[in-house]
Amino acid sequence: MPNLLSRNPFHGHHNDHHHDRENSSNNPPQLIRSSKSFLNFIGRKQSNDSLRSEKSTDSMKSTTTTTNYTTTNLNNNTHSHSNATSISTNNYNNNYETNHHHNISHGLHDYTSPASPKQTHSMAELKRFFRPSVNKKLSMSQLRSKKHSTHSPPPSKSTSTVNLNNHYRAQHPHGFTDHYAHTQSAIPPSTDSILSLSNNINIYHDDCILAQKYGKLGKLLGSGAGGSVKVLVRPTDGATFAVKEFRPRKPNESVKEYAKKCTAEFCIGSTLHHPNVIETVDVFSDSKQNKYYEVMEYCPIDFFAVVMTGKMSRGEINCCLKQLTEGVKYLHSMGLAHRDLKLDNCVMTSQGILKLIDFGSAVVFRYPFEDGVTMAHGIVGSDPYLAPEVITSTKSYDPQCVDIWSIGIIYCCMVLKRFPWKAPRDSDDNFRLYCMPDDIEHDYVESARHHEELLKERKEKRQRFLNHSDCSAINQQQPAHESNLKTVQNQVPNTPASIQGKSDNKPDIVEEETEENKEDDSNNDKESTPDNDKESTIDIKISKNENKSTVVSANPKKVDADADADCDANGDSNGRVDCKANSDCNDKTDCNANNDCSNESDCNAKVDTNVNTAANANPDMVPQNNPQQQQQQQQQQQQQQQQQQQQHHHHQHQNQDKAHSIASDNKSSQQHRGPHHKKIIHGPYRLLRLLPHASRPIMSRILQVDPKKRATLDDIFNDEWFAAIAACTMDSKNKVIRAPGHHHTLVREENAHLETYKV
């Protein structure tokens, strides 16, 4: 127990000894009031070590009593101590007579003042009471041992023993150096918390109270460096809580340091109240203060397991991103930074409300009535989520920027289902390539705007296609022979139109989709409902026929970006992408384009054969002509068949020659590139290309390596895409407000395995 208060709490100057001598005279003034103990002032019983004891009004009685106490400790040598009594009494009277006039001339008003403690020292001594002493702490057993070893009472400055102390110092000069070490504290030692005098938090120092109030601890939910979390069901009402059991106290760690670390998290969490921040309820410790328990709100859904299912829709991902950012914004408004944001420190309720947990690494960056930002220091957090400045500028960094970087990494994990890199260090190839400048400059804002226009066009064409399909369903009710006759009559005279119609209806080879269309199709698949499945399939058919025109109409930068995106769609985690598929696709499309443009006669022959087959299938449909006309038609058909066979052999040789030339070109390119024929993409685009177009403008700023260029929370909330996100939340009465357009994925552990639900 620290020495919080000395025996004379309101007398700290050497000149006060003169007043002590005067107050203990044989004829004390009548105006003197014997004050109560300081401990009586704070609600305790009166102490024998009070400022001016009521029992010490007579100086001779007090001196005799103190001398008798000294005599008892000195082997009951009454003769020698009676002499000491006479000496001390004579010295006392002489000092009183010689100094009485001197004290009155200085205007001292100890006699006339009705208040016993000095007004100039009351507040300072009160603060000293609440501040732990720096001196060495001694237990009661040590104090008693020192008393018996020196055979004398502890030195004191009380009014009844001043001369005895002077006499004791004359005989034992070495004893005065250890005055504060021998001084007994005015507050007796207690087994209560060491924080009970300086903190208003009521900490239960008995883990039995935890079991009585909340019940016994249940199964383990998770564990980490700071401790483990277990579930707890209160037997009285069946309410479920999560109890965090902090790590045990280390052998070289003091009780005060351990209590400070454990209670700091509780002090932070108990003051935070937000829909996206976990509620902290209570705190306990065992009798020896070697363990602490924190009672919190229970959320049954593990957010990390939800992300790893890969079943989150785009709307659900955006909703979780906004909820996460709302929680971080609230923390920053309170002057706190989390510094350990990650998927593991996010939990969800059964209604899809995301909450932040674990404030063990939180730090205060803005104090009340201060505008400046207090920099943080130290490497705190998990490696994949760390900001680069935490490693490069360990001694001083802005913790707000660290939280914003972690938000961007969490969003990448939700979209990609993997980490962008293991740690933001130069030794990590992924991060090193990310820090390099882009191979081609990318305008993410313009790309997002163009992509939005493309989506609008596709929606309009999808609607037109649906209307056309309805009309075609009506036309199918007509006789089949009439429709076939019309197609024959329309295709025979105008062969280029028939070629165009054939290519529009049944293209031989379809170009591969660009990254935009792939993302859109995947998004539509994820966000589609049973009512919209037909629209999604129609959308895919339309996009396949329009890729060439959209790529050509795009900006040059956008074209390069899309080309890189096509080339990187199947890349591995290192960003090395096989471009062979892309080159093969381009070669095939070139060959098909040449074949479609140059082989009109071949296509005409195919059309004629189709007409003949239709005529043979339905002989009644062929108009009745003269025998001469029939012979001429048969001759023309034979000639066309011969030409078709010749051209077919000719084009086979041409295609073989082209195939050999393409193979030789590929071999030469592979030899020129070396054994690794994969393209490596440099710069932030290697990561941003995998994210949705609409999110790239703000994500490119959130994931800025330089913290000075990184986006702030105001920039995030002012972003057009982020502001348009509809997120679920709760009102003041804890009622869930669901956002439209998406469902939340829930993962529960049932029957020893995980079950996935949608709410």
Swiss-Prot record:
GO biological process, one term: intracellular monoatomic ion homeostasis
Family per record: Belongs to the protein kinase superfamily. Ser/Thr protein kinase family.
UniProt EC number: 2.7.11.1
Name the UniProt record assigns to this protein: Serine/threonine-protein kinase HRK1
GO cellular component: cytoplasm
Enzyme class: transferase
Low complexity biased stretches: 59-97, 614-646
Active site per database record: 340
Function, as annotated: Involved in regulating the activity of the plasma membrane proton pump PMA1.
Lineage: superkingdom: Eukaryota
Other observations noted: Present with 300 molecules/cell in log phase SD medium.
Localization annotation: Cytoplasm
Comp. bias regions, Polar residues: 113-122, 493-502, 663-672
PROSITE patterns (UniProt xref): PROTEIN_KINASE_ATP, PROTEIN_KINASE_DOM, PROTEIN_KINASE_ST
Residues that, per the record, bind ATP: 221-229, 244
UniProt KW Nucleotidyltransferase keyword: no
Basic and acidic residues composition-biased segments: 520-547
Protein kinase domain mapped to chain residues: 215-722
In-chain residues carrying the UniProt-annotated modification Phosphoserine: 37, 382, 472, 498
Source organism: Saccharomyces cerevisiae (strain ATCC 204508 / S288c)
Annotated Gene3D superfamilies: Transferase(Phosphotransferase) domain 1
